[in-house]
């Protein structure tokens, strides 16, 4: 399935039905009064959050979404039927903007959340409405109102408590694959991950914690360089960031600083989120190299560094302990993951 996290669509409420002109035509009532009924209300377009959807791909194929029109009025004071509302399913985490003004219209986070985005038009009035002492046989009626027509921009922000960030090839996909049931594409070259991956990591309480592997960011990502800043929006909902640094890189400190600058430049409070700094790929380094690189990274960042090897499953237990603590979930042992111990180096 292709992951599409942005879409533009046009939504249109149904038109209200027209009122009509009619008069009573009954036996023994040769000059009956006006009896034209009112038109029905047009249907509205309503977005509904559905946890079963993970992408906005479907909207590529239905750029215009319309609700049903109201029916015109009938004789004998019968009102026209209202048009059916159009319920449109979107993934949980969809943020809705007016595409023309940029106005934020709503944020559909939880299952069943609804947002009315295009209201149906009111029905017109039949001639019975215009009966008065001065006009006993009105022929006046009104047409139904047009439904609202709005162009929307939809943006999907994944709902995850923990986001994994880092430069391409830092090992983010490997990490999420070994701590959860997620199975992202993994290879030893940059930009293997072209879409965010979600994985549920078990917690001893029985609850699952959702982790998101954010595709590799590079210098200038907040300006759209590389895979662009479109993936940074997925970090906005997270509560904790795991900042993964490749321990085999030529300059791990510089790699750390690049990502920090991108988070800071993007704004939206990303740089202020709690971060767990992690040095990955220690399985291909000797102990002295691990210690030296971790200490330099810790000194530059002003925080402790957890050292791990995602591919060798080393250090994942202490890492998850840090995650649970940051989430306020206590210091219980993580659920069984067949993990190997590792170190945390403090500056």
Swiss-Prot record:
<keyword id="KW-0547">Nucleotide-binding</keyword>
<feature type="binding site">
    <location>
        <begin position="191"/>
        <end position="195"/>
    </location>
    <ligand>
        <name>GTP</name>
    </ligand>
</feature>
<feature type="binding site">
    <location>
        <position position="173"/>
    </location>
    <ligand>
        <name>Mg(2+)</name>
    </ligand>
</feature>
<feature type="binding site">
    <location>
        <begin position="280"/>
        <end position="283"/>
    </location>
    <ligand>
        <name>GTP</name>
    </ligand>
</feature>
<dbReference type="Pfam" id="PF01018">
    <property type="entry name" value="GTP1_OBG"/>
</dbReference>
<feature type="domain" description="OBG-type G">
    <location>
        <begin position="160"/>
        <end position="328"/>
    </location>
</feature>
<dbReference type="InterPro" id="IPR014100">
    <property type="entry name" value="GTP-bd_Obg/CgtA"/>
</dbReference>
<feature type="domain" description="Obg">
    <location>
        <begin position="1"/>
        <end position="159"/>
    </location>
</feature>
<keyword id="KW-0963">Cytoplasm</keyword>
<dbReference type="InterPro" id="IPR045086">
    <property type="entry name" value="OBG_GTPase"/>
</dbReference>
<comment type="similarity">
    <text>Belongs to the TRAFAC class OBG-HflX-like GTPase superfamily. OBG GTPase family.</text>
</comment>
<protein>
    <recommendedName>
        <fullName>GTPase Obg</fullName>
        <ecNumber>3.6.5.-</ecNumber>
    </recommendedName>
</protein>
<keyword id="KW-0378">Hydrolase</keyword>
<dbReference type="InterPro" id="IPR031167">
    <property type="entry name" value="G_OBG"/>
</dbReference>
<dbReference type="GO" id="GO:0042254">
    <property type="term" value="P:ribosome biogenesis"/>
</dbReference>
<dbReference type="Pfam" id="PF01926">
    <property type="entry name" value="MMR_HSR1"/>
</dbReference>
<feature type="binding site">
    <location>
        <begin position="166"/>
        <end position="173"/>
    </location>
    <ligand>
        <name>GTP</name>
    </ligand>
</feature>
<dbReference type="GO" id="GO:0003924">
    <property type="term" value="F:GTPase activity"/>
</dbReference>
<dbReference type="GO" id="GO:0005525">
    <property type="term" value="F:GTP binding"/>
</dbReference>
<dbReference type="GO" id="GO:0000287">
    <property type="term" value="F:magnesium ion binding"/>
</dbReference>
<dbReference type="GO" id="GO:0005737">
    <property type="term" value="C:cytoplasm"/>
</dbReference>
<dbReference type="InterPro" id="IPR006073">
    <property type="entry name" value="GTP-bd"/>
</dbReference>
<dbReference type="InterPro" id="IPR027417">
    <property type="entry name" value="P-loop_NTPase"/>
</dbReference>
<feature type="binding site">
    <location>
        <begin position="213"/>
        <end position="216"/>
    </location>
    <ligand>
        <name>GTP</name>
    </ligand>
</feature>
<dbReference type="InterPro" id="IPR006074">
    <property type="entry name" value="GTP1-OBG_CS"/>
</dbReference>
<feature type="binding site">
    <location>
        <position position="193"/>
    </location>
    <ligand>
        <name>Mg(2+)</name>
    </ligand>
</feature>
<comment type="subunit">
    <text>Monomer.</text>
</comment>
<dbReference type="InterPro" id="IPR036726">
    <property type="entry name" value="GTP1_OBG_dom_sf"/>
</dbReference>
<keyword id="KW-0479">Metal-binding</keyword>
<keyword id="KW-0460">Magnesium</keyword>
<keyword id="KW-0342">GTP-binding</keyword>
<comment type="function">
    <text>An essential GTPase which binds GTP, GDP and possibly (p)ppGpp with moderate affinity, with high nucleotide exchange rates and a fairly low GTP hydrolysis rate. Plays a role in control of the cell cycle, stress response, ribosome biogenesis and in those bacteria that undergo differentiation, in morphogenesis control.</text>
</comment>
<dbReference type="InterPro" id="IPR006169">
    <property type="entry name" value="GTP1_OBG_dom"/>
</dbReference>
<feature type="binding site">
    <location>
        <begin position="309"/>
        <end position="311"/>
    </location>
    <ligand>
        <name>GTP</name>
    </ligand>
</feature>
């Amino acid at each position: 399935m292709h992951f599409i996290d942005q879409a533009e669509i046009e939504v249109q409420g149904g038109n209200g039905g027209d009122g009509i002109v009619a008069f009573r035509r009954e036996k023994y009532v040769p000059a009956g009064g006006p009896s034209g009924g009112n038109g029905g209300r047009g249907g509205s377009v309503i977005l509904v959050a559905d946890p079963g959807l993970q992408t906005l791909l479907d909207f590529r194929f239905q750029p215009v979404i319309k609700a049903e029109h109201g029916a015109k009025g009938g004789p004998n004071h019968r009102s026209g039927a209202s048009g059916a509302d159009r319920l449109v399913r979107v993934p949980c985490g969809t943020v809705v903007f007016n595409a023309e003004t940029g106005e934020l219209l709503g944020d559909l986070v939880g299952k069943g959340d609804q947002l009315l985005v295009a209201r149906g038009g009111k029905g017109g009035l039949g001639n019975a409405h215009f009966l008065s002492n001065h006009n006993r046989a009105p022929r006046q009626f009104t047409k139904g109102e047009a439904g609202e027509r709005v162009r929307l921009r939809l943006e999907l922000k994944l709902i995850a408590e923990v986001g994994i960030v880092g430069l391409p090839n830092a090992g983010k996909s490997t990490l999420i694959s070994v701590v959860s049931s997620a199975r992202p594409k993994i290879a030893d070259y940059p930009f293997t991950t072209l879409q965010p991956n979600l994985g549920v990591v078990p917690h001893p309480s029985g609850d699952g914690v959702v982790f998101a592997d954010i595709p590799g960011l590079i210098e200038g990502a907040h300006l759209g360089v590389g895979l662009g800043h479109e993936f940074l929006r997925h970090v906005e909902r997270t509560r904790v960031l795991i900042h993964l640094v490749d321990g085999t890189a030529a300059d791990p400190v510089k790699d750390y600083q690049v990502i920090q600058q991108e988070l800071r430049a993007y704004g939206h409070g990303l740089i202020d989120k709690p971060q767990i700094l992690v040095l990955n790929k220690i399985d291909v380094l000797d102990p002295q190299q691990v210690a030296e690189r971790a200490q330099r990274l810790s000194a530059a960042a002003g925080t402790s560094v957890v050292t791990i090897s995602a591919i060798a499953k080393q250090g994942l237990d202490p890492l998850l302990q840090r995650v649970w603590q940051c989430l306020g979930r206590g210091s219980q042992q993580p659920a069984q993951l067949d993990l190997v111990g590792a170190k945390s180096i403090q500056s």
